[in-house]
Amino acid sequence: MTTVEAPTGAALNTTWQNAPTHTINAGGVQFAYRQLGPSTGVPVVFLTHLAAVLDNWDPRVVDGIAAKHRVITFDNRGAGASSGATPRTIEEMARDAVTFIRALGFDQVDLFGFSMGGMIAQLIAQEEPQLVRKMILAGTGPAGGEGIDKVTRISYQDTARGLLTRRDPKEFLFFTRTPNGRGAAKDFLARLEERTNDRDKAISVRSFRAQLKAIHRWGQQAPADLASVRQPVLVVNGERDRMVPTQNSVDLDRRLPDSRLVLYPDAGHGGVFQFHEDFVKRALEFL
């Protein structure tokens, strides 16, 4: 993977498949990131899921939102092409994200957090409320949420299942095993391979384990007072999320003062990828 320091005032690419990878030094970490879409307006910062690097974002979702908004994605500390040791708490990851955002010179952003990224987004909104304008939380849950402390077991089980069946574990973790779910998984994984040049580094086993510990701790924490989150929030999930149980999305919607909830039928953790066309439409209407 080739990374370059981002030039000031660089033109933004509007295709995720060809968006160049840049780096920026912030807080002693060299963060790898990509950006595309319009050069003006409030940017949407994407916060990644467990074990994810830049190339794990669905091109249809990125390009869809980038059609109207500047999109910025980055590798968490210690993941992919970003330097440093992977944090073992969601709190540290949230601080890293704020450091990265401020290093790019932004005073206000929108956040799209998927799974672990949604946990990070919640903390940013609580700790740095002036930084966040709006927030999309997909396939995620609050601190102490139902079944979140079981993500480690489910992840290891489905990783082993993937090895035994020679399939990508995301087929089991993100999608239902119905005909619709299987078809959506196949299409999603094919889209992840559309970018052929300048691909990111896969996450290391050490980083993966550190992230699992962070999620486990999040699942065991005392519930936070989400009434303090005053920003508009779009909560999205599949009706059958077995990784971060769907009840957590319902709980978020109930506890957040200004939220709306979308649950996709016959869909699991990766509902936003299975129903990417509808999700992008709703996201653009919300942002």
Where are these regions (language model features)?
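Conserved HGGG/HGGXW glycine-rich cap/lid loop of the alpha/beta-hydrolase fold
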Residues: 27-83
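Active-site loop/oxyanion-hole signature of alpha/beta-hydrolase fold enzymes
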Residues: 72-112, 281
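Gly/Ala-rich beta-loop-alpha elbow adjacent to hydrolase catalytic centers
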Residues: 113, 117, 121
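Flexible "cap/lid" loop of the alpha/beta hydrolase fold
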Residues: 126, 133-165
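Conserved alpha/beta-hydrolase catalytic His-Asp/Glu region
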Residues: 168-220, 224-225
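Short beta-strand/loop motif that positions the catalytic acidic residue
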Residues: 229, 235-237, 241
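Conserved alpha/beta-hydrolase "acid-adjacent" motif
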Residues: 242-248
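Catalytic histidine-centered segment of alpha/beta-hydrolase-like enzymes
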Residues: 264-280
